[in-house]
Amino acid sequence: MAQTPEGKVKEKVKKILKRRGVWFFMPRGTTFGTAGVPDFICCHEGRLLAIETKAGGGQPTKLQLNALRSILNHAGCALVVRETNVDAVEQALDFIECNSNTALCWRGFDEEADRQPDTR
């Protein structure tokens, strides 16, 4: 079965997380799940890291951006990863390792660039 472009990004992220020894899981979107939950929920050095993956021109939905924002507001780290910035995962993990005893958080998404256009 051919992998989707977003699936390829997820595979790259998964390889990095496994190589770095990061605990993570990938919530499955179901009818009974919570909409907007990031693709990867990770814990590294006691810090929450949420990763939303996108491919091509895909943009996070408003619910996804709200979830990422909420994680940041609770001292977690959050980022949107695309084919062009998979290295942001490594950078976020490095940041966590260097700042694991501080209240700093990693913001790996641009609210303006990643905003879902309002189509109402």
For each feature predicted by the language model, list its residue ranges.
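Catalytic phosphate/metal-binding cores of nucleic-acid and nucleotide-processing enzymes, i.e., regions
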Residues: M1-R120
